[in-house]
């Protein structure tokens, strides 16, 4: 490694590798630099690439590197070394024990260019030398002059009043704010019943919450089906049978008996005997159901039917409403 003479006031950094120490090149370089420079600092390449290490900024006048052709983290080492060098300082890289250093020097040349070094020169003794730019402002000035063009900042065109265009007001920002509670409107509509659907003598409270009994599903396993079957066995049926009609003038007679259903289960039945043939109706709508009957109608509570038709009503029918 051919070293350039240094003054005793210059600070020099030597970065080497284990290969350079194995072949004795590192020890020879240390002796030569100690005799020529005032202050010599030595580090292995692993120390430089360590993320925890940061060399002093703008400190060294020259940096020498003795490295192998492979296994060097240039992207981590060169930026640190460049920051530790004073402007205009030189960096010299030498390859250790390489038979064909041309490919190595080409790689190092590219890495030095990427790191921002200038004045890169290659020597026959398998070494390459470069320098840190003297000033970043000078480099920028030179690049601008060489291209013959400079960046021109574009200005916004002013309007007729001499000022910049004003932002247009949003259309919805000029309208008054209106708040509508959709949920409250829906609840109010559900509670309100139109007058056309209510009769004068209707006593049903439509504002009260309605309940619906849950029915057992097809594959019920929670016991609800057993409860329904028990309720069905104990339920009362209301039958209107024209063959058992007795009395006159629409009179109504109730008889409670126990009968067996088609499946052999017993049911308590309340029979209501009504003479529909003798009943009179001023409205003619008594047989259409409770919605068309007066409050004093003798058929109030019975479903819609025709004279002579058999009707059966479970006593717990109101659970489904």
Swiss-Prot record:
Subcellular location, record wording: Cytoplasm; Mitochondrion intermembrane space
Motif (Cx2C motif 1): 283-286
Cofactors that this protein relies on: [2Fe-2S] cluster; [4Fe-4S] cluster
Major place of residence: cytoplasm
Molecular functions (GO terms): 2 iron, 2 sulfur cluster binding; 4 iron, 4 sulfur cluster binding; electron transfer activity; metal ion binding
Domain of life, source organism: Eukaryota
Pfam family name, one: DRE2_N
Iron keyword on record: yes
Cross-referenced InterPro entries: Anamorsin (IPR007785), CIAPIN1 (IPR046408), Dre2_N (IPR031838), SAM-dependent_MTases_sf (IPR029063)
Motif Cx2C motif 2 in this chain: 294-297
Region (Fe-S binding site B): 283-297
Region (N-terminal SAM-like domain): 1-140
Binding-site residues for [2Fe-2S] cluster, renumbered to this chain: 202, 217, 220, 222
Keyword Endoplasmic reticulum: no
Biological-process GO terms, alphabetical: iron-sulfur cluster assembly
Biased composition (Polar residues): 128-138
Region named Disordered: 128-166, 239-263
Any GO CC annotation of this UniProt entry: mitochondrial intermembrane space
Positions of region (Linker): 140-177
Record key words, sorted: 2Fe-2S, 4Fe-4S, Cytoplasm, Iron, Iron-sulfur, Metal-binding, Mitochondrion
Ranges for region Fe-S binding site A: 202-222
Subunit (UniProt): Monomer. Interacts with TAH18. Interacts with MIA40.
Free-text function comment from the UniProt entry: Component of the cytosolic iron-sulfur (Fe-S) protein assembly (CIA) machinery required for the maturation of extramitochondrial Fe-S proteins. Part of an electron transfer chain functioning in an early step of cytosolic Fe-S biogenesis, facilitating the de novo assembly of a [4Fe-4S] cluster on the scaffold complex CFD1-NBP35. Electrons are transferred to DRE2 from NADPH via the FAD- and FMN-containing protein TAH18.
Similarity comment text for this entry: Belongs to the anamorsin family.
Domain statement: The C-terminal domain binds 2 Fe-S clusters but is otherwise mostly in an intrinsically disordered conformation.
Entry protein name: Fe-S cluster assembly protein DRE2
């Amino acid at each position: 490694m051919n070293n350039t003479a240094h003054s005793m006031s210059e600070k020099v950094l030597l970065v080497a590798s284990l290969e350079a120490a194995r072949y004795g090149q590192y020890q020879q370089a240390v002796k030569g630099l100690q005799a020529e420079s005032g202050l010599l600092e030595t580090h292995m390449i692993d120390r430089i690439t360590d993320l925890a290490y940061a060399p002093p900024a703008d400190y060294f006048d020259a940096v020498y590197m003795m490295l192998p052709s492979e296994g060097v983290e240039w992207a981590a080492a060169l930026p640190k070394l460049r920051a530790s060098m004073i402007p205009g300082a030189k960096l010299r890289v030498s390859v250790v024990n390489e038979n064909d250093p041309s490919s190595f020097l080409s790689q190092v040349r590219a890495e030095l260019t990427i790191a921002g070094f200038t004045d890169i020169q290659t020597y026959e003794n398998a070494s390459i030398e470069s320098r840190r730019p003297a000033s970043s402002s000078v480099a920028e000035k030179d690049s601008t002059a060489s291209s013959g063009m400079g960046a021109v900042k574009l200005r916004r065109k002013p309007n007729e009043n001499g000022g910049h265009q004003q932002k247009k007001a949003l259309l919805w920002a000029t309208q008054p704010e209106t708040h509508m509670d959709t949920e409250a409107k829906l609840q109010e509509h559900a509670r309100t019943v139109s007058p056309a659907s209510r009769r004068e003598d209707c006593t049903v409270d439509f504002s009260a919450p309605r309940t619906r009994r849950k029915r057992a599903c097809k594959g019920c396993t929670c016991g609800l089906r057993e409860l329904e079957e028990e309720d069905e066995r104990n339920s009362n049926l209301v039958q209107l049978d024209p063959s058992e009609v007795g009395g006159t003038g629409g009179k109504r007679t109730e008889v409670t008996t126990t009968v067996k259903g088609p499946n052999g289960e017993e049911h308590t039945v309340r029979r209501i005997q009504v003479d529909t043939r003798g009943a009179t109706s001023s409205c003619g709508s008594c047989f259409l159901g409770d919605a068309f009957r007066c409050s004093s109608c003798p058929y109030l509570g019975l479903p819609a039917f025709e004279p002579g038709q058999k009707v059966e009503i479970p006593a717990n029918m109101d659970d489904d409403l």
